[in-house]
Regions:
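Secondary-structure transition/capping motifs at alpha-helix termini
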Residues: 27-36, 81-86, 130, 163
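Nucleotide-activated donor-binding/catalytic signature segment of Leloir-type glycosyltransferases, i.e.
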Residues: 4-50
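Hydrophobic, well-ordered secondary-structure scaffolds
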Residues: 8-14, 133-134, 157-159
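Short acidic alpha-helix that forms the nucleotide-activated donor recognition element
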Residues: 48-59
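Catalytic binding pocket for nucleotide-activated donors in carbohydrate/polymer assembly enzymes
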Residues: 1, 15, 57, 61-144, ...
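C-terminal alpha-helical cap of glycosyltransferases
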Residues: 147-163
Length: 163
C-alpha cells in the first residue's frame, strides 16, 4: 500500500512526480491485477493518525525513502506503532534525518532502485529474532531521545553560541 497524500500541490515538480507515480501504479495494476487482487494500493489522500497507526502496525515493511528530508517523523511513527511480538522492518532513506538515530533500520540510497529491491528482499526473508532485535534498538532510541531531550539539546546548542 502506498499512501501518498498531496503535499506541496502547488509545486510543479511535485505535480509532475505525482503524475508519474499515478501512471506507473496504473500501468503495473493493469498488467498484474486479477479480479480479486491488486498489486499496488495507491491511496492519494491523507488518513488520521489512528488509521495510519493501524496501517503501520499491520505492515511487514515500512518503506520511508525521501530524497531529502528533515527528521522524518513517519519513520519514528512506524517504529512506535509496531507490535512487539511481531514487528515490521523499517527501510529508511540515508537522506532522512532519522537515519542517524534509527540504526535498526535498513538504510538505503533512495536513488538506487536495486538497493531498495535488495532491502525489501532482505526484509521479507529476515528472521523474527532479527526483526525484534532491530525494533528494540529503534524503540529504545525513540524513547530515550524524546521531544524533551531534543528541546534541551537545542537550547544547549543555542546557548553555546558565542558572537
Amino acid at each position: 500500500m502506498q499512501i501518498a497524500p498531496i503535499s506541496r500541490g502547488d509545486v510543479w515538480q511535485y505535480k509532475e512526480l505525482r503524475q508519474e507515480l499515478e501512471t506507473e501504479a496504473g500501468h503495473i495494476n493493469g498488467l498484474y491485477s486479477d479480479f480479486d487482487w491488486t498489486p499496488i494500493r495507491y491511496l492519494n489522500r491523507g488518513f488520521n493518525r489512528k488509521i495510519l497507526a493501524g496501517f503501520f502496525r499491520r505492515s511487514q515493511i515500512g518503506l520511508v525513502t525521501p530524497f531529502r528530508d528533515g527528521m522524518n517523523l513517519v519513520a519514528k511513527e512506524y517504529v512506535a506503532a509496531q507490535d512487539p511480538s511481531n514487528p515490521g522492518v523499517l527501510i529508511l532513506s540515508q537522506f532522512a534525518g532519522a537515519a542517524e538515530e534509527l540504526d535498526g533500520a535498513i538504510i538505503v540510497n533512495p536513488y538506487d532502485i536495486e538497493a531498495i529491491t535488495e532491502a525489501i528482499n532482505i526484509s521479507l526473508k529476515m528472521s523474527s529474532e532479527e526483526k525484534l532485535h532491530r525494533w528494540i534498538r529503534m524503540i529504545e532510541q525513540i524513547n530515550e531521545f524524546d521531544i524533551h531531550k531534543w528541546s534541551k539539546n537545542c537550547i544547549k546548542a543555542i546557548e553555546s553560541i558565542t558572537l
